[in-house]
Amino acid sequence: MTYRPLLNDLVDMAAGRAPVDLVVRNARIVDVFSQRIVEAPLAIGGGRFLGFFEAEAHATLDAEGRYLLPGLIDGHVHIESSLVSPAQFARLVLARGTTAVIADPHEIANVCGLAGLRYMLDATRDLPLDVRLALPSCVPATPFENAGAVLDAAALATLMDDPRVAGLGEMMNFPGVLAGDADVLDKIALALDRGKTVDGHSPGLAGRDLATYAAARIATDHECTTVDEMHERIALGMYVLLREGSAARDMARLAPGITPGNARRCVFCTDDRQPADILRDGHIDNHLRIAVSHGVDPVTAVTIATLNAAECFGLRDRGAVAPGRVADFVLVDDLTGFAVRKVYAAGRLVARDGAVVVDLPDHADPAVRDTVNIRPLDDTAFRLPLPTGLARVIGLQPHSLLTDALERDVPRDASGCFTPGDGLVKLAVVERHKATGNVGVGIIEGYGLRGGAVATTVAHDSHNIVVAGDNDADMLVAVRELERTGGGITLCAGGRVLASLPLPVAGLMSDRPATEVSATFAQMLSIAHETLHISRDIEPFMTLSFLTLPVIPALKLTDRGLFDVRTFSFTTVGV
């Protein structure tokens, strides 16, 4: 932005030569700089905080003794994973006190390339939610799958100078970093040369490998699942983004690792969170509740949720209640439950008691529709011949993106093909961008599905079709339903569709209101658990969507076959 026209107004209002826009009285203001509570009037004008003083004002607000926090910031989120459009996502999180997010749109980029990134910039431009993009670093995530696009450093350079671009998105290709891969380092330099942040992704890295990764000036990691991992990264100068999503829930394990000495290197993030979870449990406000319940000082927790995130990603005019900063703030009842009563963005009321009170413009773009393009399949598409009964199996872990690499004696039919049973379910990935006909087939344990199939076009990160089932016929019905709807999530049994949630925007997002999407999703969850018997320890759809991501250990499945993340190479299902 250009500050000069704004400065005259700010200085005149702060100096008393002009009325301010708003004075907030009777608030307990959380001062994240001095780690204290301030009780003083707060003057706001021109969408900015002016200072702690009384002033002639166009309007006043009685906070009635509530706590006033800076607007909450999500340090790493994939908006597409909310299954709704950016405007509908904003409606969900603004109501919970989140006023800024660092969004990595690598989901839509893997489907639509630069057109998807431009859509995300255009769709968020006029929202009261401040959306900064971290340009996807790994499209495709690896060279071991087929995505809808390839984005090299030259492609990213066309958008990196946009002021709403915070930097480079999570560098999932940590083997490429360690090996000094030229394309990887070119992308990192693209952000660093502009003084922007490089976001990280380094599950399981430790010791010299982690130090090498950090030496590449990668600033963050949101893949920590233990306190030891968290502390090792902080000791290397990295920020740790403590994640509480829908499938990956790490806060309870990591919050005890927050100390007075390391708290300023912590940030909160959701990564992937679905509408029902946001509506029920909240967004970054949920992180605050969890942190405090695990003994973190409330003001420290607020600092993590605001100032730390702002400083990590270069949002220099946000993250604190201080003169000159954007007047994003939240009124909450107390510093334990953090019940959000009012939310202001740039000095304007945007949400009250859980409801957004301003119009949020939606954005339509034909470039991100009609994205399901598959070669016709027949009833042999999902056959899995095995040389013996011993097979490599993907073992699911409750509430985690990690999987186990298992070996199991599996049932086979007379022709030597795997037949689901004994707690084992068939998994397939169908390429859906260029109609290559690629179909990868594997076996999972711990999903619990019986009597049907589940399929979705949300399949990180290349977003091919992933389908799980205990019979090939229902798996085929499910894939054809996704082709019909232009993408989405579907449940099938007995040769018919039980329920579907169409996601026509890139096969990732709905064009319907968030409440409608949430209601449909809740109905489908019920069917998944009760009719198809999927384990209640598993989030059926998001868990399925991560079984295709070949950068999180240990075994994953792509459209090209079974992939061992530990060795970064393909392996066979048969042992």
From Swiss-Prot:
It catalyses: adenine + H2O + H(+) = hypoxanthine + NH4(+). GO terms for molecular function: adenine deaminase activity. Keywords: Hydrolase, Manganese. It comes from the Bacteria. GO terms for biological process: adenine catabolic process. SUPFAM superfamilies: Composite domain of metallo-dependent hydrolases (SSF51338), Metallo-dependent hydrolases (SSF51556). InterPro entries: Adenine_deam (IPR006679), Adenine_deam_C (IPR026912), Amidohydro-rel (IPR006680), Metal-dep_hydrolase_composite (IPR011059), Metal_Hydrolase (IPR032466). Its EC number is 3.5.4.2. It is an enzyme of class 3 (hydrolase). It holds the Pfam family Adenine_deam_C. The keyword Phosphoprotein does not apply. Its cofactor is Mn(2+). The keyword Transport does not apply. HAMAP family: Adenine_deamin. Belongs to the metallo-dependent hydrolases superfamily. Adenine deaminase family. This is Adenine deaminase. It comes from Nitratidesulfovibrio vulgaris (strain ATCC 29579 / DSM 644 / CCUG 34227 / NCIMB 8303 / VKM B-1760 / Hildenborough) (Desulfovibrio vulgaris). The lineage of its organism: Bacteria, Pseudomonadati, Thermodesulfobacteriota, Desulfovibrionia, Desulfovibrionales.
